[in-house]
């Protein structure tokens, strides 16, 4: 998939003035780090955007704690760029970004999700759920920085599930990518009712490497950049 993307004329074409310096915070998926979005970062930078990593490690921590960290990164990137920023998240990173956008719409210009099961994060592949639950057992043994049982059955789970079920504020437009070929996050669970939903033909992990993703994303991001205000909106 990577060679195909690198050969694609739409991906290789550089338009350094298109983004106008609009910031984009990149949030990786469960079990992946910031380097998993390095090609997206390069594509954004070549078009005049200012991408920044979320710096949440491998995205295996407590949901509420990770949203707190994403919020702080949003604040930093808004301060750095002087205006609201776009959140672009893959899989779990997408719905974590949605939680942060719902909490702080004053910081978010738009939201892009790739294979993010916002309608039911626990409705993903049983294999992934088993891996996540294994982390809670390690957490119970004292290993820090991991999901815990509260993220599955306690206040953390219930609070964040309710937030995901709520509509996004009108000031935060959203674009949700999903694939019927996705064997990790079912296509139906990625249909965010607050977003413009777009279908592409891709596996779950290769979605951010698909030329169609960039072809569809480009005009949307450019429109957000062109119409953006230069300062964060009031809460």
Please provide the spans of the model-predicted regions.
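Flexible, membrane-associating and regulatory peripheral segments of lipid-active enzymes
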Residues: 1-25, 32-42, 47, 230-235
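Helical cap/lid subdomain of alpha/beta-hydrolase-fold lipid enzymes
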Residues: 102-103, 109-235
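Serine-dependent carboxylesterase/thioesterase catalytic core
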Residues: 22-30, 35, 39, 45-54, ...
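Glycine-rich phosphate/ribose-binding loops and adjacent secondary-structure elements
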Residues: 59
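Short, flexible hinge/linker loops that cap or flank conserved catalytic cores
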Residues: 16-19, 79, 168
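Generic hydrophobic, helix-prone segments enriched in Leu/Val/Ile
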Residues: 1-6, 70, 131-132, 187
């Amino acid at each position: 998939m990577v060679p195909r993307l690198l050969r694609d004329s739409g991906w290789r074409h550089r338009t350094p003035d298109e983004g106008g310096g609009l910031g984009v915070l990149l949030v990786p998926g469960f079990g992946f780090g910031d380097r998993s979005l390095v090609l997206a970062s390069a594509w954004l930078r070549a078009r005049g955007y200012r991408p920044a990593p979320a710096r949440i490690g491998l995205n295996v921590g407590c949901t509420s704690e990770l949203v707190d960290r994403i919020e702080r990164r949003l604040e930093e990137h808004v301060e750095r760029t002087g205006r609201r920023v776009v959140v672009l998240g893959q899989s779990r990173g997408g719905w974590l970004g949605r939680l942060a956008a719902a909490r702080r719409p004053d910081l978010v210009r738009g939201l892009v999700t790739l294979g993010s099961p916002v309608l039911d994060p626990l409705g993903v592949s049983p294999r992934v759920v088993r891996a996540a639950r294994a982390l809670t057992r390690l957490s119970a043994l004292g290993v820090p920085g991991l999901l815990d049982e509260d993220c599955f059955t306690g206040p953390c789970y219930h609070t964040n599930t309710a937030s995901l079920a709520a509509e996004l504020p009108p000031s935060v437009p959203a674009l949700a990518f999903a694939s019927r070929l996705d064997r990790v996050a079912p296509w139906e669970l990625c249909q965010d009712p607050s977003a413009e939903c777009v279908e592409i033909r891709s596996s779950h992990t290769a979605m951010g490497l698909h030329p169609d993703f960039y072809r569809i994303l480009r005009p949307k991001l450019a429109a957000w950049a062109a119409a953006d205000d230069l300062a964060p909106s009031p809460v």
